[in-house]
Curated annotation (Swiss-Prot):
The keyword Ribosomal protein applies. One of its GO terms (molecular function) is structural constituent of ribosome. GO terms for cellular component: cytosolic large ribosomal subunit. HAMAP family: Ribosomal_bL27 (MF_00539). The gene is rpmA. The lineage of its organism: Bacteria, Bacillati, Cyanobacteriota, Cyanophyceae, Oscillatoriophycideae. It comes from Picosynechococcus sp. (strain ATCC 27264 / PCC 7002 / PR-6). Transmembrane segments: none annotated. This is Large ribosomal subunit protein bL27. InterPro entries: Ribosomal_bL27 (IPR001684), Ribosomal_bL27_CS (IPR018261). The keyword Ribonucleoprotein applies. NCBIfam families: L27.
């Protein structure tokens, strides 16, 4: 039997929490005002109609409605929210 406890590595064994980025509400989903649509770093997706952009580039809905992802300007993407009654 060992009379001394084995020494473990004290410098490893940690990792930082992932950032949980990405699309949170997809095209066709119904959202309420203030709902987060996309969490991102930089503008991979640009804000469209009725969508605001936070200080950390998070996109959020400014009105209740239905989410729609659209292409515009040479390969760029934007996300818009259209009121539910207008899309019917």
């Amino acid at each position: 039997m060992a009379h001394k406890k084995g020494t473990g590595s004290t410098r490893n064994g940690r990792d930082s929490r992932a950032q949980r980025l990405g699309v949170k509400r997809y095209g066709g989903q119904t959202v309420t005002t203030g709902s987060i649509l996309v969490r991102q770093r930089g503008t991979k997706v640009h804000p469209g109609n009725n969508v605001g952009r936070g200080g950390d580039d998070t996109l959020f809905a400014l009105v209740d409605g239905i989410v729609k992802f659209e292409h515009y300007k040479r390969g760029r993407r934007k996300v818009s929210v259209y009121p539910a009654d207008a899309s019917a």
